């Protein structure tokens, strides 16, 4: 007698529910997506105990035909695809025909629905079995209530998290729906407390304001890019506003919120050197493409997708964000808040950005955008100072020739303000005046940005600038590191450092790039070797980038080093020539502005 048997529909649905319905948030996602597929312009969500006790989704979509209502709860019954060809041109959020059957098998469900000019009906199901059907009066649309989720699967029930955690997961789902469908009025309430409410205006920025608040999204940039295959719209909250998680990056492909590591990384690469370490941006990335280029039939929950031209899309996202941010004047402004009642309390300061209009990035501009050449900077007028400390001779200042003194202020590129050097504060910050107010420049961060951009270019062309050493350097390698030297040697060779074995645990360096600091060659080589040994399976581009950042940090002016006016002037001239003068490679601000108006407010000259 054989031992293989066909499973009952009830058991098969429960097994399917294990993949489709993981938690209350899964139910909310599936039912809200069904409402959107039904053409709803308003969706209401009501929750009790974070959906574990009750979930009600109400919409004004086209509703079910009476004869389709029961069939909708049969596994793999759907109106969204008809044959295998439709599977490769999916334009709806749902298509598998599994969600309702899976949800009904692990809960108690009540469906109320009415189609235009049809009779309204109500169905009641218990563990997927129909227990009641009746006619009702209602407006066009659908209301679906799910109660006692997982009551018949105790194993799944015990793995649910706390009410707070489950509610956070639901809120995250609803936030992404709001961003993906800003033209739909979305209202969600949990035991009397509103979770989200959008106005359905069609403006993603309004949805962002509803979720994160108007103050957070001030200065949001909108950037667009196109190729033959993709249309891209990026909503980028100013780089100063960051979060501790990548979860605030929302990817929307053809109206579907998805998770994709490569696309998320492309967003972060676009913000490169503008974000502090461990911080992430708030961004909504919308992509429209031919359905043939995307496979959403990867997982029953439809969270993951496959893209046939993923690398091209990643490049488009990265370049669109990078070029958009590079065109902005991202100088934080210091604005005082209202003073506290305690007169001795110090006034708090907030930062904000001034965002300029963003031009659309066409396919040509994304791939062939010429980096504008900055105008040569002249010298600023230097007011006399009563006390100028002598410079520290150990400071490694740029080697560029110093232009002659003139009475003109610093002439810079279109993004960087014209500045007059006033002096130095605490031997760490350069104080400047400009047309709009007063500026403070972090001298270490400023030179770090200058050197980073220089080193990055130099590392990209090591073979063009190499020199033989008259006295080669010898380095001893720890036994633990010797095992990785076969991986490290190609990286060092690609940045211009030629190492040869010189004993069981020694290597000799005979060639180095000509631009290495002549008095710090040995130290620089050791630092680059250490940087390579610290990495695990790193590619050449990443190594060059990390090495440029490391060297820029270690070779730049430190805090508490006095500079004379000529050094400060030259530092600002060189900073103005960089591609992104407003942050150091680690994402910290280089320059901060106090506007004239805010200074007058601090001195109570204006109200």
From Swiss-Prot:
Residues 374-411 are annotated as: Disordered. The keyword DNA repair applies. Gene3D superfamilies: 3.30.230.10, Histidine kinase-like ATPase, C-terminal domain (3.30.565.10), MutL, C-terminal domain, dimerisation subdomain (3.30.1540.20), MutL, C-terminal domain, regulatory subdomain (3.30.1370.100). PROSITE patterns: DNA_MISMATCH_REPAIR_1. One of its GO terms (cellular component) is mismatch repair complex. Residues 397-407 have a biased composition (Acidic residues). InterPro entries: DNA_mismatch_repair_CS (IPR014762), DNA_mismatch_repair_MutL (IPR020667), DNA_mismatch_S5_2-like (IPR013507), HATPase_C_sf (IPR036890), MutL/Mlh/PMS (IPR002099), MutL/Mlh/Pms-like (IPR038973), MutL_C (IPR014790), MutL_C_dimsub (IPR042120). The keyword DNA repair applies. Keywords: DNA damage, DNA repair. One of its GO terms (biological process) is mismatch repair. GO terms for molecular function: ATP binding; ATP hydrolysis activity; ATP-dependent DNA damage sensor activity; mismatched DNA binding. This protein is involved in the repair of mismatches in DNA. It is required for dam-dependent methyl-directed DNA mismatch repair. May act as a 'molecular matchmaker', a protein that promotes the formation of a stable complex between two or more DNA-binding proteins in an ATP-dependent manner without itself being part of a final effector complex. PANTHER family: DNA MISMATCH REPAIR PROTEIN MLH, PMS, MUTL, DNA MISMATCH REPAIR PROTEIN MLH1. Belongs to the DNA mismatch repair MutL/HexB family. This is DNA mismatch repair protein MutL. It comes from Exiguobacterium sibiricum (strain DSM 17290 / CCUG 55495 / CIP 109462 / JCM 13490 / 255-15). The gene is mutL.
């Amino acid at each position: 007698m054989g031992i293989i048997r066909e499973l009952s529909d009830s058991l098969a649905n429960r097994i399917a529910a294990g993949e489709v319905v993981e938690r209350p948030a899964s139910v909310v996602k599936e039912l809200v997506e069904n409402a959107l597929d039904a053409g709803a312009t308003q969706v209401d969500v009501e929750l009790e105990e974070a959906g574990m006790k009750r979930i009600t989704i109400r919409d004004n979509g086209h509703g079910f035909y009476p004869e389709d209502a029961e069939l909708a709860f049969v596994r793999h019954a759907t109106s969204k695809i008809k044959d295998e060809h439709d599977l490769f041109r999916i334009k709806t959020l749902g298509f598998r025909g599994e969600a309702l059957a899976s949800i009904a098998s692990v809960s108690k469900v009540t469906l109320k629905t009415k189609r235009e000019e049809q009779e309204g009906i109500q169905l009641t199901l218990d563990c997927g079995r129909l227990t009641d059907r009746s006619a009702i009066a209602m407006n066009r649309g659908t209301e679906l209530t799910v109660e006692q989720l997982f009551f018949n699967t105790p194993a799944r029930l015990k793995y649910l998290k706390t009410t707070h955690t489950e509610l956070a997961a639901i809120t995250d789902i609803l936030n992404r729906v709001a961003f993906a469908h800003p033209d739909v009025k979305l209202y969600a309430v949990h035991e009397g407390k509103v979770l989200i409410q959008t106005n359905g205006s069609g403006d993603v920025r309004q949805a962002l304001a509803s979720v994160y608040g108007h103050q957070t999204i001030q200065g949001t940039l909108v950037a667009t890019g196109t190729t033959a295959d993709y249309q891209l719209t990026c909503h980028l909250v100013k780089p100063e506003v960051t979060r501790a998680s990548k979860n605030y990056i929302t990817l929307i492909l053809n109206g579907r919120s998805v998770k994709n590591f490569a696309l998320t990384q492309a967003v972060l690469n676009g913000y490169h050197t503008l974000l502090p370490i461990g911080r992430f941006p708030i961004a909504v990335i919308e992509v429209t493409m031919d359905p043939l280029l995307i496979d959403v039939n990867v997982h029953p929950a439809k969270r993951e997708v496959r893209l046939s031209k993923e690398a091209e899309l990643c490049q488009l996202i990265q370049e669109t964000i990078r070029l958009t941010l590079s065109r902005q004047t991202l100088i934080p402004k210091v604005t005082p808040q209202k003073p506290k009642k305690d007169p001795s309390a110090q006034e708090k300061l907030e930062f904000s950005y001034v965002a300029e209009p963003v031009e659309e990035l066409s396919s040509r501009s994304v791939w062939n955008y010429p980096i504008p050449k900055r105008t040569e900077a002249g010298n600023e007028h230097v007011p006399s100072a009563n006390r100028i400390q002598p410079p520290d001779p150990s400071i490694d200042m740029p080697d560029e020739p110093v232009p002659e003194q003139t009475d003109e202020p610093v002439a810079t590129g279109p993004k960087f303000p014209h500045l007059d050097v006033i002096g130095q504060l605490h031997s760490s910050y350069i104080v400047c005046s400009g047309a709009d107010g007063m500026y403070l420049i972090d001298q270490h961060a400023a030179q770090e940005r200058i050197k980073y951009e220089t080193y990055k270019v130099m590392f990209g062309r090591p073979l063009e600038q190499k020199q033989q050493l008259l006295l080669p350097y010898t380095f001893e390698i720890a036994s633990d590191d010797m095992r990785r030297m076969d991986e490290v040697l190609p990286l060092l060779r690609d940045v211009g450092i030629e190492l040869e074995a010189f004993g069981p645990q020694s290597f000799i360096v005979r060639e180095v790039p000509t631009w290495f600091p002549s008095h710090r060659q040995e130290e620089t080589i050791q630092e680059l070797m250490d940087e390579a040994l610290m990495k695990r399976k790193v590619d050449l581009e990443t190594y060059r980038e990390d090495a440029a950042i490391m060297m820029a940090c270690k070779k730049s002016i430190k805090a508490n080093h006095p500079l004379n006016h000529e050094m400060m002037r030259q530092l600002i001239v060189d900073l103005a020539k960089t591609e992104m003068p407003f942050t150091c490679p680690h994402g910290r601000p280089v320059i901060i502005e106090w506007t004239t108006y805010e200074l007058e407010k601090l001195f109570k000259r204006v109200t």
